[in-house]
């Protein structure tokens, strides 16, 4: 939890909010931050924490106040950082209890169900001092922030196991997710394209790599030499853009090189990024400097599919399928010793998209 981290100078366009996984999740936040978050100027009912759009939260705390109304309970929940009002709707009794049962057996069953329901309600009744978990949407009522619950329940936690687990979990979630500013890759790409001269060398290299990937996919290129990419006008214009130099790296000498040498270097680095993602690869250790596009190498797809299909017939792989590392080892033995994990992962995803193979569990694949 960082003071002032909920403020964001410029809101991300609401059309891009769906790219942030926090937007669709029940965010586990401290109550203090829920109370301090600023409401979006674009969409009422959506709040911003460090640029992350949040409309649903998950809180765990102690009940410090109870008010009952005809349709709902109002619980004051305290997690030691703040207190927030939670509106928890009563369950509607849809069964008609006034209808007279037609037989003694039905009378007995009805009375037993009624007693069971009363017992459950009595044991789950929430009172001051109880621990409660609430998941719901954030609302503002009479200028006070509150949570309208979609689900809530009393937590049986006599030795504080659940509360301690939450206390240990939240700092990690904040550090890895909430305190990392939300930046949409689509927005960054749009900004970069509109003003490529404002990029440093790594950012320009990354952008060139993305544009090269789009070019290869749109034109269904099967293989290429680096020099061929350097002749594509749109890519060449992008590579020729000036860059912001970093004084603490070797980038300061980038523009001192000859233009052709600098362009060759940035294209080489951009292709290397594609190789690291498994989108392109080289055969025979790259002696001929020819790159192959993973998506278009049908022969590689067929061989990987055959490995999975054949090994899944063996007794030790029939139930769960073949593990990723087993497929990788077989592929390196029968196809190419230098096959990378990234390339294999790309091939497996393509085969799965085509329904040639199925993922039975994490990292396990089978073919029919």
From Swiss-Prot:
Keywords: Chromosome, DNA-binding, Nucleus, Telomere. The keyword Nucleus applies. It holds the Pfam family Stn1. It is found in: Nucleus; Chromosome, Telomere. Residues 296-368 are annotated as: Winged helix-turn-helix (wHTH) 2. Residues 191-295 are annotated as: Winged helix-turn-helix (wHTH) 1. GO terms for molecular function: single-stranded telomeric DNA binding. GO terms for cellular component: chromosome, telomeric region; CST complex; nucleus. The keyword ATP-binding does not apply. Belongs to the STN1 family. Component of the CST complex, composed of TEN1/C17orf106, CTC1/C17orf68 and STN1; in the complex interacts directly with TEN1 and CTC1. Interacts with ACD/TPP1, POT1 and POLA1. This is CST complex subunit STN1. The gene is STN1.
